[in-house]
């Protein structure tokens, strides 16, 4: 029961305990399918057109072709003095092949998750018959695919909404579980800025609507989401492009170094075969991060999708990691939104107990959190009646009446609702409105609460004070953001005194009271003028300019079409609080990329000490063979086997992301160097030595 908004959805219906084993089973089957599809896709990505998009792995791909050639013809580049060169070159070719394949597999697994989500979205699309409404009121059944922007359709209970649109007449409950996963229906009505947008593929479960189509065939919300999560040509983010260029430059430097080695080797009387040169190049270039870079970026979008948020691009997710300022609405983001009964205020000479009694009767059939809180507050005062459900009848809240209540035996009527609605109800029954009601109304409003008037028949007994509760743990989350250098600004329509109290309780850095939609744009522009990146949420048409202005704009799925088109992310659950989680995911993406880059470059140090000393053994460089590797063949194979296996070993970390901690930039740098820098040096030393021992045991040294 909320006279100012649709009935809240029941979040508890989302996952019952009995559903969880089946859900886990489905998840396991889905994951298995992703990996099976990725195996095939990894082979498809071996074609040159795909391989050349990754400069680092393309060098490995070319090296594989070269070693395959010398496996077939060992003397292709001159006479070799190796023992059994075809066996060594064949093993080397196999290792290089799997190095490329593992990198492709990592990218294919990350892409597979997006394809699985696209399949889920595609399953909601079905061609149905739509009731096309002509200007003269005639209804014609037409295929939904023939609808175009501007058409008007009529939908009734049980119908699937044929296309995206705006409600222009009617009020109805809509099941959006096919898109959001939320089983509770959502109220849609005309004339509401945030509840008038409907999505094709959802189903009406009660009443009827007249909808104006806002999207041509193939350009609806679901179509756009499928294209986004399944797009074959993923646009790299600016940071990803910069890192790719850096890795390519490093690879070219190492290529130049390796290309000049034969000259030095000739004067050192230590000739180097072409397969060894290829192996040395592959060992030195940053193949680990080169093989996982695409997977990290794709997985970032996937982690956002797991929160039921669709990002228009990886650029949007990455921008979240650089956000400096969050602009947040108070209601639903900082406060619960489901206001709870705080106090009964009597008027017209009535007592608190009398107000509580009428409020209890008017709310006893109300199953919303607000209605239940009114009953609880009344029962704390000792109020309770034994109502016969067969004789009393509950009256549900509706957007038209803006009130709810109970019809009692004998024709008596108890109602609660918006003050204006109750005034109209009482006047229609020849009741009297006193100035005390307006005084109580202002008293509650000045405290930032919502006033509900309570009446029995044509007599108003008093006002219920509904208080908006600050969300539990929100202060700690803002503290975490503050430690990361993210500033929070609360926008609210409340007066300055109320806004100040809530801001202090929630722990935001700044607030703007009595805010208008224009204030949102002003705040965003002010912060951006200071060189900051800004994120915000919105759902109404009046939020669209601010969503477009923000670096990260998250639109609610229940919002208007204009808001969703202006934003670069859409939250299918319509939960504004998710903005905080999205920012954390963006920062986790950047941290993961930085950590694995550090680890990959540190790996090269160990591989350098593994191969160089044994290649130039006759040049008195054995003192650098700190791992005491058996032979040149053993050192090369050990380093490259490690080089290949570390890629699949790090796939789970690349997909899941490095554990995120709210630390400062200096603390993050120190942590990365200690764990992934030092660890990246030590781990390959140990692994390469163990592999060398195994190779020696099987006689390949």
From Swiss-Prot:
Mg(2+) binds at residues 539, 543. It catalyses: K(+)(out) + ATP + H2O = K(+)(in) + ADP + phosphate + H(+). InterPro entries: ATPase_P-typ_cyto_dom_N, ATPase_P-typ_P_site, ATPase_P-typ_TM_dom_sf, ATPase_P-typ_transduc_dom_A_sf, HAD-like_sf, HAD_sf, P-type_ATPase_bsu_IA, P_typ_ATPase. It comes from Anabaena sp. (strain L31). Its EC number is 7.2.2.6. Residues 1-28 are annotated as: Disordered. It is found in: Cell membrane. ATP binds at residues 366, 370, 397-404, 416. HAMAP family: KdpB. This is Potassium-transporting ATPase ATP-binding subunit. It comes from the Bacteria. Pfam families: E1-E2_ATPase (PF00122), Hydrolase (PF00702). The active site is at 329 (4-aspartylphosphate intermediate).
């Amino acid at each position: 029961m909320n006279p100012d908004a649709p009935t809240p959805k029941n979040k508890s219906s989302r996952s019952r305990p009995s559903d969880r084993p089946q859900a886990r089973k489905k998840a396991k089957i889905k994951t298995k399918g992703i990996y099976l599809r990725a195996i095939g896709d990894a082979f498809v990505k071996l074609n040159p057109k795909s391989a050349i998009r990754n400069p680092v792995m393309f060098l490995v791909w070319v090296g594989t072709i070269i070693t395959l050639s010398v496996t077939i013809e060992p003397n292709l580049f001159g006479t070799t003095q190796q023992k059994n060169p075809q066996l060594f070159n064949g093993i080397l070719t196999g290792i290089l092949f799997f190095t490329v394949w593992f990198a492709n597999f990592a990218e294919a697994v990350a892409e597979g998750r997006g394809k699985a989500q696209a399949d889920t979205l595609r399953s909601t699309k079905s061609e149905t018959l739509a009731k096309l409404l002509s200007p003269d009121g005639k209804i014609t059944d037409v295929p939904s695919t023939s609808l175009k922007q501007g058409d008007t359709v009529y939908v009734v209970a049980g119908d699937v909404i044929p296309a995206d649109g705006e409600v222009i007449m009617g009020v109805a409950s809509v099941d959006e579980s096919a898109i959001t996963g939320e089983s509770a229906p959502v109220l849609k009505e005309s004339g509401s800025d945030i509840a008038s947008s409907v999505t094709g593929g959802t189903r009406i479960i009660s009443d009827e609507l007249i909808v104006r189509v806002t999207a041509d065939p193939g350009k609806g919300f679901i179509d756009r989401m499928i294209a986004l999560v399944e797009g074959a040509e993923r646009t790299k983010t600016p940071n990803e492009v910069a890192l790719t260029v850096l890795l390519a430059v490093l690879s070219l430097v190492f290529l130049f170094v390796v290309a000049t080695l034969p000259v030095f080797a000739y004067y050192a009387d230590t000739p180097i075969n072409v397969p060894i040169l290829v192996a040395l190049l592959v060992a030195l270039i940053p193949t680990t991060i080169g093989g996982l870079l695409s997977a990290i970026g794709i997985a970032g979008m996937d982690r956002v999708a797991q929160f039921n948020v669709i990002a228009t691009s990886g650029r949007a997710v990455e921008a979240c990691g650089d956000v400096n300022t969050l602009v947040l609405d108070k209601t639903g983001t900082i406060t619960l939104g489901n206001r709870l009964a705080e106090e009964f205020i009597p008027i017209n000479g009535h007592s608190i107990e009398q107000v509580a009694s009428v409020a209890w009767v008017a709310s006893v059939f109300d199953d919303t959190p607000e209605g239940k809180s009114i009953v609880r507050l009344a029962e704390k005062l000792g109020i309770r009646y034994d109502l016969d459900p067969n004789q009393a009848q509950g009256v549900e809240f509706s957007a038209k009446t803006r009130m709810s209540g109970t019809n009692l035996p004998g024709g008596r009527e108890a109602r609660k609702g918006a003050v204006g609605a109750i005034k109209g109800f009482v006047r229609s029954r020849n009741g009297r409105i006193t100035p005390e009601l307006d005084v109580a109304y202002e008293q509650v409003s000045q405290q930032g609460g919502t006033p509900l008037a309570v009446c029995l028949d044509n007599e108003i007994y008093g006002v219920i004070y509904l208080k908006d509760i600050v969300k539990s743990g929100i202060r700690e989350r803002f503290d975490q953001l503050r430690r990361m250098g993210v500033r929070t600004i609360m926008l609210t329509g409340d007066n300055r005194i109320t806004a100040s109290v809530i801001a202090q309780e929630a722990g935001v850095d700044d607030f703007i009271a009595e805010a208008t939609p224009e204030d949102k744009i002003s705040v965003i522009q002010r912060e951006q003028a200071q060189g900051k990146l800004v994120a915000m949420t919105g759902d109404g048409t009046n939020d669209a300019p601010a969503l477009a202005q923000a670096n990260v704009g998250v639109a609610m799925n229940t919002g208007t079409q204009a808001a969703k088109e202006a934003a670069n992310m859409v939250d299918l659950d319509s939960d504004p609080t998710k903005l905080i989680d999205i920012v954390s995911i963006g920062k986790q993406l950047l941290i993961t990329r930085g950590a694995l880059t550090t680890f990959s470059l540190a790996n090269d140090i160990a591989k350098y000490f593994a191969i160089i000393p044994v290649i130039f053994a006759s040049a008195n460089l054995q003192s650098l063979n700190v791992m005491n590797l058996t032979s040149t063949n053993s050192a090369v194979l050990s380093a490259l086997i490690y080089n290949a296996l570390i890629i699949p070993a790090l796939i789970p970390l690349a997909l899941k992301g490095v554990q995120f901690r709210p630390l400062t930039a200096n603390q993050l740098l120190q942590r990365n160097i200690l764990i992934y820098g030092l660890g990246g040096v030590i781990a390959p030393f140990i692994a390469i030595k163990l592999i060398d021992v195994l190779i020696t045991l099987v006689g390949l040294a």
